[in-house]
Amino acid sequence: MSTKNRSDKSSSSSITKDKYTIILPTYKERENLPIIIWLISTELEKCFIDYEVVIVEDNSPDGTLEVAQQLQKIYGEEKIKILSRPGKMGLGSAYMDGIKKSTGNWVILMDADLSHHPKFIPQFIEKQKKLNCEIVTGTRYQSGGGVFGWNLYRKLTSRVANYIASVLLTPGVSDLTGSFRLYRKDVLEKLITQNKSKGYVFQVEMMVRANQLGYQVGEVPITFVDRIFGVSNLDSGEIVGFLKSVLNLFMNIE
């Protein structure tokens, strides 16, 4: 680990009161949003965790923005912040825009479709404090983790894709494509700025860059549940595209 990153780590440990910003990019999540917000509120408040949720809404045609506004009235503007964008502008830009509205010193990235249960967030925080690390990522591929709602084909393709990416890129984590993660805010900003990938490979490059820069990453086993409402966007074409993008990342990453 570089001297700079070691000094960064020691300065972060001096913070006595942490606040966690949860960034939720949304597109057509009308049914899921009220449930995930309720779960976040329930799980974090019972652990006395200081938090806020930033909903980054990409002009959903199903009324997701209106639902978000109703939730803001229920939970309050201090807990629920809304950023309305003109359309789908990419995951990286959604995270960066969410960071700009955040007031926390730590940022949690997760999906709004109920694939990621907020009950794991306290475990992420506990792991971070135990290791004093800059990043914690959820993993489906360690003991205690798993996937529910996927057929055998999808499980196998996910495993194979992760294995190929791990062999080529040696990122030091067991679940490269997961998007349920805790970052120190300044670290997240730096990684996103350097990230050149799109789609599912965006998450892969985040871990590869983190490893290159000497950041420590903790892992917490999670159970991933396929979305209840709405349609999953993953298909065989995207899997092929993912593998091509991983190869491109391997050839070009500096």
From Swiss-Prot:
Entry's EC annotation: 2.4.1.83
Record-listed GDP-alpha-D-mannose binding positions: P25, Y27, E29, V56, D58, D111, A112, D113, R140, R227
Binding site for Mn(2+): D113
Pfam family, one: Glycos_transf_2
Subcellular location: Endoplasmic reticulum
Protein keywords: Endoplasmic reticulum, Glycosyltransferase, Magnesium, Manganese, Metal-binding, Transferase
Cofactor note: Binds 1 divalent metal cation.
Catalytic activity from the UniProt record: a di-trans,poly-cis-dolichyl phosphate + GDP-alpha-D-mannose = a di-trans,poly-cis-dolichyl beta-D-mannosyl phosphate + GDP
GO cellular component: endoplasmic reticulum; endoplasmic reticulum membrane
Residues that coordinate or bind Mg(2+): D113
Molecular-function annotations in GO: dolichyl-phosphate beta-D-mannosyltransferase activity; dolichyl-phosphate-mannose-protein mannosyltransferase activity; metal ion binding
Enzyme class: transferase
Pathway(s): Protein modification; protein glycosylation
Cofactor: Mg(2+); Mn(2+); Ca(2+)
GO annotation (BP), single: protein O-linked mannosylation
InterPro entries xrefs: DPM1-like, Glyco_trans_2-like, Nucleotide-diphossugar_trans
Record function comment: Transfers mannose from GDP-mannose to dolichol monophosphate to form dolichol phosphate mannose (Dol-P-Man) which is the mannosyl donor in pathways leading to N-glycosylation, glycosyl phosphatidylinositol membrane anchoring, and O-mannosylation of proteins; catalytic subunit of the dolichol-phosphate mannose (DPM) synthase complex.
SUBUNIT field: Component of the dolichol-phosphate mannose (DPM) synthase complex composed of dpm1, dpm2 and dpm3.
Family: Belongs to the glycosyltransferase 2 family.
PANTHER family reported for this sequence: DOLICHOL-PHOSPHATE MANNOSYLTRANSFERASE SUBUNIT 1 (PTHR43398:SF1)
Protein name: Dolichol-phosphate mannosyltransferase subunit 1
Lineage, broadest ranks: Eukaryota, Amoebozoa, Evosea, Eumycetozoa, Dictyostelia
